[in-house]
């Protein structure tokens, strides 16, 4: 298979897409190289960082996946998905306490995002009033 470099595809997005295609095709080691090439072109390409974490994990390179996930959390410290990716890699590598801590951090970040979101337009109880559930069977 042809080596993935910045000369084979000119943009980080092209390289990222190549990595996604390789990952979907089961070629995790090659996908990792494509994601690394995308990051070399644009170090702030968040999707490529996420892809690299996944590709390394799928390739069984768990410690490298953890390192890539830590780099991602440093790049995007308020991103719950980055902390979730770190948690998954840590868990797969057997670092359960650290995985649980990363998962807890992801939950806290998600809650913060939810709290900053505008409340729903419906008043209290309105969402339940409009809820319709299919009734199965009959009630005696």
Regions found by a protein language model. Name each.
Residues 1-14, 139:
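TPR-adjacent "capping" and linker segments in tetratricopeptide-repeat scaffold/adaptor proteins
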Residues 9-41:
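Alpha-helical segment of the N-proximal tetratricopeptide repeat
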Residues 25-37, 59-71, 93-105:
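Structural signature of tandem alpha-helical TPR/SEL1-like repeats
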Residues 41, 74-75, 108-109, 113:
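Structural marker of alpha-solenoid helical repeat scaffolds
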């Amino acid at each position: 298979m042809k080596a993935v470099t910045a000369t084979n595809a000119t943009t980080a997005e092209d390289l990222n897409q190549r990595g996604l295609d390789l990952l979907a095709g089961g070629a995790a080691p090659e996908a990792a190289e494509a994601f690394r090439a995308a990051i070399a072109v644009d170090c702030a390409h968040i999707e490529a960082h996420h892809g690299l974490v996944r590709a390394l994990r799928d390739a069984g390179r768990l410690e490298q996946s953890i390192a890539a996930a830590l780099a991602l959390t440093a790049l995007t410290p308020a991103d719950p998905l980055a902390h979730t990716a770190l948690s998954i890699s840590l868990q797969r590598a057997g670092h359960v306490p650290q995985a649980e801590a990363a998962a807890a951090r992801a939950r806290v970040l998600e809650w913060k995002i939810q709290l900053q979101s505008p409340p729903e337009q419906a008043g209290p109880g309105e969402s339940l009033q409009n809820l319709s559930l299919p009734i199965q069977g009959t009630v005696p």
